[in-house]
Amino acid sequence: MDQHKGDASLGGIVKALGLVFGDIGTSPIYTLTVIFTLTQPTRENVFGILSLVFWTMTILVTMEYAWLAMSLGRKGQGGEIVLREIIMKLVKTGRLVAFAGFLSFVGVSLLLGDGVITPAISILSAVEGLLLIPGLEGLSTGTLVAIAAAIAIGLFSVQFKGTDRVAGAFGPIMAVWFSTLAVTGVVSALSMPEIVEAINPWHAFTFFRENGLAGYFVLSEVILCSTGGEALYADMGHLGRRPIVKSWYFVFMALYLNYLGQGVFAITHPEAKNLLFGMVRDQMPTLYIPFLILTIMATIIASQSIISGVFSIVYQGITTRLLPLMRVDYTSREIKSQIYLGAVNWSLMVAVILVMLLFRKSENLAAAYGMAVTGSMTITGIMMIIVFAHTTKKWRALVALVITLIDAAYLLSTFSKIPHGAYWSLILASIPFVTIIIWTRGQRSLYHALKPLDLETFLISYEQIYAKGPIRGTGLFFTRDTDVVPPYVVHCIIRSNIIYERNVFISLVITDEPLGVETELIKGIGPGLDAFRIEAGYMEVVDIEALLKANGIQEKVIFYGVEDISTRNPLWRVFSVFKKLTPNFVQFHKLPASRLQGVVTRVEM
């Protein structure tokens, strides 16, 4: 399994801070504050919670993602779709492949649903820091929500311009943010040096023993310290493994030092409503406003990384045929992976603002937050067990099993959040999940309903018609495979006698590798008939027109099929609506409109 190590220099590490760690890096704004609204901040409880935070970040982020998951890259790429492709290549059993496919569908859906709640809670929690500024204590909840919504609208409104111009500043800003977290945490912790003893897992066991079942359900809030940990693996393709892992060591230290400082502040100021903001204002009141500005910038960067991550996941889903085609715009001439999906962007913005309006406070959002990410972690763990069980490193499957059981324990604890709004995570995740199921099954059913003709049978009639005299020029026909002929091609050539001097069947095959483009021109499969096969990785941006020119194919007209679906099945009706509302293949690949000719085929499903 190929691993791209990446740039582990200081520049690469700083860049990773801005691109990967925004989500987990803003967790200190709300994590302990939420926990200690539910749990009394006694000395024993604080030590127990801080112990749980340390071991949660160690096991679920460092071990699960930085160590295990990031060893399973493919050409440097990571994520649950990558794990699915690895399993499909390793495993031959149909049921296990189907199970892995289903898990990846659920995992991707949970991550997309999480992409709504994360920007909402990050921005809202930062804006709530305004309440600690003298003179602004009386700001209403509605005003705070309006400010947070305005920031979100501004962020989503500039996505179409791309982020490459300002992305260079993300890393340095986040470096300042993490350094500030570390320094403020140390300053607070110095007043109670024994707080470092919280690392001892015995404090966590004592907390469970003293609090019983209530202590177990606190895990549903403790997990907030690790939300965003999955980004280490998902974003591996952008930077490589080494800079992300090295950055994580610094981020881990900065985060935990801040949590220790907040723990001390919670013990000495049990009445505090927001631990991070209260601690910083107590330490340096004159610098509180600059810190608040830095906090808002950090949450904007965190939200930007989530938005970019959602774009990337959806693009992977499109290219692997899990999701319908959507219009994709490329926001950078130099970096093809920087993309903008308008439909996703505006849908995400509406959902984020809706969530802000529904929950109104970050503590309310925190009550709904965590189920999706723990579900995703558990699914990643199960998929890693399958992968490692089919490799020579079978002992890692045992380690992955232990971690997955811990994931499952956290996931089970989050079920206590369902009455408090966690069902919104499930509702949000169900939208992409249902879309994936309908789209994948619909495509399969449509392909069978079309009843393509095998090439040998097609060639018998084709050769007879070609002998009568073809039209001058070159005609291109898109097919799923060069060995079978779709009905629209049969209609064009056999029934309508539209045949050119040179006819080329073009097929685009998505491989199970993330990157790489290969082409093969097969000449003479019939008189005046060639086949052009493109094999591309599922993360590649394929310029079909450029590939045609590079292989000397100058088309006069490009034919493609348009299916007119007739059905009584309600699922296939939804599938038909998806087909009508989304771009078709040639529109997605931006082929020249003046040369396109759609051929309608009526299909009974």
UniProtKB/Swiss-Prot annotation:
Q: Which residues form a coiled coil?
A: none
Catalyzed reactions: K(+)(in) + H(+)(in) = K(+)(out) + H(+)(out)
Its GO CC terms are:
plasma membrane
Q: Which GO terms describe its molecular function?
A: potassium ion transmembrane transporter activity; symporter activity
Q: Where in the cell is it found?
A: Cell inner membrane
* Key words of the record: Cell inner membrane, Cell membrane, Ion transport, Membrane, Potassium, Potassium transport, Symport, Transmembrane, Transmembrane helix, Transport
On whether Ion transport is a keyword of this UniProt record, the answer is: yes
Parts of the chain that traverse the membrane: 16-36, 46-66, 97-117, 138-158, 166-186, 212-232, 248-268, 287-307, 339-359, 368-388, 397-417, 418-438
The UniProt entry lists membrane topology as: Multi-pass membrane protein
What PANTHER family does the annotation carry? K+ POTASSIUM TRANSPORTER, OSMOTIC STRESS POTASSIUM TRANSPORTER
Task: Write out the similarity annotation.
Answer: Belongs to the HAK/KUP transporter (TC 2.A.72) family.
Supply the HAMAP family for this chain: Kup (MF_01522)
| Function field | Transport of potassium into the cell. Likely operates as a K(+):H(+) symporter.
What protein name does the entry list? Probable potassium transport system protein Kup 1
| Gene encoding the protein | kup1
